[in-house]
């Protein structure tokens, strides 16, 4: 009887050690997993930057001038980043920002060699230019996007719909090719 009590006590101690040992391993493994997660959360993704050309009219409205800009493309496409840079405008007093500040870019999509640029109605409503201004507005958009070699044509839409013209002077109902005549 004494021997069975000793064996039972030893078995109890042995089982306690086994359970405690398993628990300790699980805690260590759990800590390793937690550490890995924390390390991954603190990593920052590399911000990709590219150099592009953005086209602005000169202050005399006689030609478009290419301006080199470096833009971040993390979380967006290079085409949208280029349009955002065009919409930011320029600080150069010899150049003019042509897209109204109130206009909103709704999106840029590419299908084959054609980019579709969608603005809200603010582009039309707040644009103040005449026929030359409209030509430079369209030319700035088209030439900025066709500076990417894979883009050959640009379709400008308003609220997702094709429009005949922005202000009555220039047909934008179909995709437009690069406007090199404005670069003289």
Locations of regions flagged by a protein language model:
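Bimodal "functional hotspot" detector
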Residues: 2-184
């Amino acid at each position: 009887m004494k021997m069975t009590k000793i064996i039972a006590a030893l078995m109890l101690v042995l089982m306690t050690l086994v359970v405690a040992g398993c628990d300790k391993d699980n805690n260590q493994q759990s800590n390793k997993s937690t550490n890995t997660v924390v390390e991954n959360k603190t990593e920052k993704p590399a911000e990709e930057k590219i150099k592009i050309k953005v086209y602005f009219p000169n202050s005399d409205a006689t030609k478009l001038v290419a301006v080199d800009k470096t833009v971040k493309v993390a979380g967006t496409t290079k085409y949208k980043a280029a349009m955002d840079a065009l919409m930011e405008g320029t600080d150069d007093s010899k150049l003019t920002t042509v897209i109204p500040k109130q206009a909103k870019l709704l999106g840029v999509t590419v299908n084959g060699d054609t980019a579709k640029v969608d603005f809200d109605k603010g582009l039309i409503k707040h644009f103040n230019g005449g026929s030359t201004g409209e030509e430079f507005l369209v030319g700035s958009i088209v030439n900025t996007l066709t500076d990417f070699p894979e883009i050959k044509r640009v379709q400008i839409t308003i609220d997702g719909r094709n429009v005949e013209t922005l202000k009555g002077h220039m047909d934008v109902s179909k995709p437009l090719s690069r406007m090199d005549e404005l670069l003289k």
